[in-house]
Amino acid sequence: VRLKEGVDYVVVDTGDPIPDEYDCVIMAEDLIWVSQDEVEIIKPAIPWQNIRQIGEDIVEGQLILPQSHRIRPADIGALIAGGVFEVEVYKKPKVAIIPTGTELVEPGEELKVGDIIEFNSRVFAAQVEEYGGIPTRFDIAKDDFEKLKAVVDKASKEYDIILLNAGSSAGREDYSKKVIETLGEVYIHGIAIKPGKPVILGKVNNKPIVGIPGFPVSAYFIMENIVKKLINFVQGYDIKDKRYIEATLSKRIMSSSKYLEFVRVKLGFIDGKYIAAPIERGAGTTMSLVRADGVLEIPEELEGYEKGTRVNVNILKSEDEIKNTILCIGSHDLILDIAADLLAKRGKFTLSSAHVGSIGGILSLKDRETHFATIHLLDVETGEYNKSYVKRYIPNRKIALIKFVKRIQGLMVKKGNPLEINSLEDIVKKGARFVNRQKGSGTRILLDYELKRLGINPKDIIGYDREEYTHISVAAQIAKGNADAGLGVFSAAKIMDLDFIPIANEDYDIAIPVEYLELDGVKQFLEVINSEEFKNELDKLGGYDYSNLGEIIIIE
C-alpha cells in the first residue's frame, strides 16, 4: 500500500501530539520511501497503533503517591508528569552525636598510656546518614558532670535527636544517666539484648536521647536496632530491610536465656546449602563486625543452638556475594589475609576464613561445612605433619593435601627480651607469664609435644590455661605487657615488634576435598597463592618457606 504525504499521512516526531484526523502512527523503520513525499507500508497498521492515549499514565484526581511514602527517583518523574511540583515531606532529623570520656583522644593525636582513639562517633555519623538523618558530631566531652550537662542541654534545644556515647554503665564517671535525669527523664536503663544491654532511653526538652554503650559492637547493635527505628519513625516510615537466609551452624553456640543475643557469623555456600561459622562474640571486638558476613539472632528464651541446627541469619552481603565466597575454616595465619586481599583484587570471588584451630578445621571438613581447612598438625609418633590426621578423621572421602608453606614456630617475647627467655625451660625457671593457644590448634599440639619431650609439667607454666585464638592475639597480649611469652609464628612477632626465639619448623597446609578443586573460586584461589605477587608478600613478612607451594598430595 502506498501513501501520499499531506493526503494519507503527516510526519510527526516522537512525543508530538497527533492531529485529530489521524489515529495511527507507523514507525519510520517500517516504511519504504518511494519518493520524497510518498511511502509504502510493508505490514498492516491498526487504529491507535504506537499512540499513547491521554490519561494512559496519569489522570486528574489519581493518587500518585500515598502518605508516608519514601520518595524514590522514579517517583519524582511521576509527580512532575502529574503536575505536582511541591509536596510536603517529613524533614530529615538533625542528630547530635556527643562522644564522652576523659580517656578519649581524636585520631592523629599523640597517645599516652590509657588513651583510646575516639571513632564511635564517626561510625554513628555514617550510620545516621545511611538511615536518612543529618548528623553533627560534637567535640569529645570529658567526664565532668556540669560540662556534660551543659553540652546535652544545648544540643537538645538545637537538634531533633541526641546520641550520647559511653557513660551508660554504672562506673564512677558514667554520668549519662544522671545528666538525662537532671535535664529530663530516663524511661529505660538497660534492655535484654547482648551486646548492648546498658543502653539508656530518655528525653531532654522533649527531644529523644539515647545513651549508647562505649563498646563498639554494643554501640553498633544499638544503632541498628534502636536508633535506626527512631530515625525512621520521625520520618514517617518503617523500613524492614533486613534480609535473611537459612543456614546450617558449623558449631554449637551457647547463650544466656536472659538476652536476645546477636552473634556474628562467617557464611559460605557449600554443596547446595549455606553454612554459618560463628566468630568472636566480645562487645569490644571491632574487627568481628568488619569480618562478619551475617548476624544470627538468638531469642531470649533459648540457651543456644546445637551444631548442625538450621537457623535464620540476617545477611550483611548479597546472596550472590556469599555464593561467590570460598569458606576456609581452620588454623589462623596472617598469610590468609594476604591471599584474601589478592583474591578480592581479581574481582568475582572472596575468601572468608574462621579461625577455630586445625582440629576444628578438619572436623568442619568432615561434616562438609567448609570448602577447605588450613592445618598444621604434628603426628607425635612419626614426626610427620597433617597426613595422618586427615586419614584418621576423614577416612571415607578423597582429600587433597595442598602444600602451602613451611613456617617457623617459636617463643614470642617483649622487645629486648627483658627476662632473657631462650627456651621453654626458661618459662618455668623464671616464672614467666605465658599466653597459650586454644585446645585443638596445631600450635597447642606442638607446645604439648615439646613440653612432653622436655619433661615439663604444663601445670608448672603460669598461664598455660589462658587461651587466645590467633597468633596475632597472642602477640598482642605480650606487646601490651599482659603476658611475658607465648608460642606463635615469626610473622606475628614481627608485626607486633617482639623478639622471637625459634622452636620448630612446621608444615602449614591446605586440606580440601578433591571434587572442590574443580570449583572456579578454588581455582582462582590456587592461582593467587601460586602467584609471584603472593610470594613477594610472604618474603616481606619473613619466616616462610614456600619452596613446595602448590604441590598436591592425594589422600585416600
What name fits each language-model region?
Residues 1-139, 275-280, 311-317:
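Short, glycine/charged-enriched hinge/interface segments at domain edges or termini
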Residues 58, 181-323:
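Flexible glycine/proline-rich
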Residues 87-212, 216-221, 342-347, 374-378, ...:
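Helix-rich terminal scaffold detector
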Residues 323-332, 424-445:
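Short loop->beta-strand "edge-of-pocket" segments that line small-molecule binding or catalytic clefts
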Residues 338-347, 424-425, 437-439, 443-466:
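Ligand-binding cleft/hinge of the Venus flytrap
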Residues 344-426:
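N-terminal segment of the mature folded domain
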Residues 374-392, 475-504:
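A ligand-binding cleft/hinge motif common to bilobed small-molecule-binding domains
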Residues 396-408, 498-527:
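Periplasmic-binding protein-like
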